[in-house]
C-alpha cells in the first residue's frame, strides 16, 4: 500500500478542499489519462485497486503511471470510546484530489479503445467522478 516513509507532522487537521488543481492537470508521461472532475479524498486502497483493474484490463501491456500519492493521514478513535482524551491514531492515508487533477496515465502503445475501457473501469473504483482524456484530440 502507499504510505509515506516519513511525515513532517504525525497528525493533521481535517481541512477543506477548495478550488481547482494548480498543477498536475495535464498529461506528462503517457497519451491517455484519467482526470478528476470533482473533489475527493482518494485512499491508498482506492489507488491500489484502480491500478490493479487497469493492469488487468490492459493484460500487462503498456505502461501505467500513478500521478498521485496519499500524503495526508486520517485519524480515527476506536469504537465505544468516550469523547476527549486526545486525537485518535492514524487509520489510513489519503490524497486530497481537486477538480482537474490527472490521477493515472497510460502509454501510447495501447489502443485507444482499450485505454478508455481500462480507465473507465478504474473510475468505478474511485470515490469521485473522473473523465478520460487523451493527447489525440
From Swiss-Prot:
Function: Binds 23S rRNA and is also seen to make contacts with the A and possibly P site tRNAs.
UniProt-recorded name of the protein: Large ribosomal subunit protein uL16
Gene source species: Wolbachia pipientis subsp. Culex pipiens (strain wPip)
InterPro entries hit by this protein: Ribosomal_uL16, Ribosomal_uL16_bact-type, Ribosomal_uL16_CS, Ribosomal_uL16_dom, Ribosomal_uL16_sf
MF term (GO), any: structural constituent of ribosome
UniProt gene name: rplP
UniProtKB keywords: Ribonucleoprotein, Ribosomal protein, RNA-binding, rRNA-binding, tRNA-binding
UniProt key word Magnesium: no
A cellular component annotation (GO) from this entry: cytosolic large ribosomal subunit
Family: Belongs to the universal ribosomal protein uL16 family.
GO biological process assignments: translation
Pfam families: Ribosomal_L16
Subunit (UniProt): Part of the 50S ribosomal subunit.
